Amino acid sequence: MSDRLKPLIGTAATRPLSREEAEFAFECLFEGEATPAQMGGLLMALRTRGETVDEYAAAASVMRAKCHKVRAPHGAIDIVGTGGDGKGTLNISTATAFVVAGAGVPVAKHGNRNLSSKSGAADALTEMGLNVMIGPEQVEACLLEAGIGFMMAPMHHPAMRHVGPVRAELGTRTIFNILGPLTNPAGVKRQLTGAFSPDLIRPMAEVLSALGSEKAWLVHGGDGTDELAISAASKVAALEGGQIREFELHPEEAGLPVHPFEEIVGGTPAENAQAFRALLDGAPGAYRDAVLLNAAAALVVADRAAHLREGVEIATDSILSGAAKAKVALLARLTNAA
């Protein structure tokens, strides 16, 4: 331990840290050079004042540099949310990932176990028979053979072991709730990323731009979820060519009906997996339409679809043809053979 972080804790409470100061601070955290009290002090100073784009970018760049990296196919996309919306929906981004992969777009999905719901991405995949506790080489093999791979955050970010206990003790949101979607170990350049607050979508788009993303949609559902909503309009910050455009998106613009929010509320991992299997078998309803909407957006971001309605058509075919279901079965086989 050292006292190198101490001076920056007070500074962080009174003014934004420069990119260089923030990088230094997070180097201290990730190298285990700070005491738990110092870590907590810094995280809460940032939270209370409000983190800046430079601070997000600095933390993400240090975290990316220290992760166990994965080589992904060209054009791979990540489909992920911050979590923390407290809505407990069915696993929409997880199902979306398989639908998009079934449409021929490589998906390098970064995720974790449940943080804000009864069933996070890793919980749902485990229930579906996948082994999520695999390392970078096995994930790369999955991406090459199946066109989809799941990167379990703790398997790829060992530096987080220093911070994890402090986060658990604080029991409140910190900058790390935002960093997951910004620190994909495959370094993908395209993202469909959900945020738990509409106030985060533009800053997160700015961070992804600073970190080299080519095209990304940052979204927040009007129902309060960290994905495109099927029950209301959603806010979008679309990054492309270094420019950010903000707009609202309604399900009907994609040719999809509006459904009551209650129809996509999830349950236990087993219950969510049952709904996921029904969706893969073609069961219609709010869950499928929510996945189709998010998959359509991901296909637009990946340049697989020119517009949302075309994306819905491609995503529907991925489900009804059995392609999405086949991706789940193949990934289950590959991960359990690893």
From Swiss-Prot:
5-phospho-alpha-D-ribose 1-diphosphate binds at residues 81, 84-85, 89, 91-94, 109-117, 121. Keywords: Amino-acid biosynthesis, Aromatic amino acid biosynthesis, Glycosyltransferase, Magnesium, Metal-binding, Transferase, Tryptophan biosynthesis. The keyword Ribonucleoprotein does not apply. Binds 2 magnesium ions per monomer. It catalyses: N-(5-phospho-beta-D-ribosyl)anthranilate + diphosphate = 5-phospho-alpha-D-ribose 1-diphosphate + anthranilate. Mg(2+) 1 binds at S93, E227. One of its GO terms (molecular function) is magnesium ion binding. It is an enzyme of class 2 (transferase). Pfam families: Glycos_trans_3N, Glycos_transf_3. It comes from the Bacteria. Its cofactor is Mg(2+). The keyword Metal-binding applies. Mg(2+) 2 binds at D226, E227. Its EC number is 2.4.2.18. Pathway: Amino-acid biosynthesis; L-tryptophan biosynthesis; L-tryptophan from chorismate: step 2/5. GO terms for biological process: L-tryptophan biosynthetic process. SUPFAM superfamilies: Nucleoside phosphorylase/phosphoribosyltransferase catalytic domain, Nucleoside phosphorylase/phosphoribosyltransferase N-terminal domain. Transmembrane segments: none annotated. Anthranilate 1 binds at G81, N112. Anthranilate 2 binds at R167. One of its GO terms (cellular component) is cytosol. InterPro entries: Anthranilate_Pribosyl_Tfrase (IPR005940), Glycosyl_Trfase_fam3 (IPR000312), Glycosyl_Trfase_fam3_N_dom (IPR017459), Glycosyl_Trfase_fam3_N_dom_sf (IPR036320), Nuc_phospho_transferase (IPR035902). Belongs to the anthranilate phosphoribosyltransferase family. Catalyzes the transfer of the phosphoribosyl group of 5-phosphorylribose-1-pyrophosphate (PRPP) to anthranilate to yield N-(5'-phosphoribosyl)-anthranilate (PRA). This is Anthranilate phosphoribosyltransferase. It comes from Cereibacter sphaeroides (strain ATCC 17023 / DSM 158 / JCM 6121 / CCUG 31486 / LMG 2827 / NBRC 12203 / NCIMB 8253 / ATH 2.4.1.). The lineage of its organism: Bacteria, Pseudomonadati, Pseudomonadota, Alphaproteobacteria, Rhodobacterales. The gene is trpD.
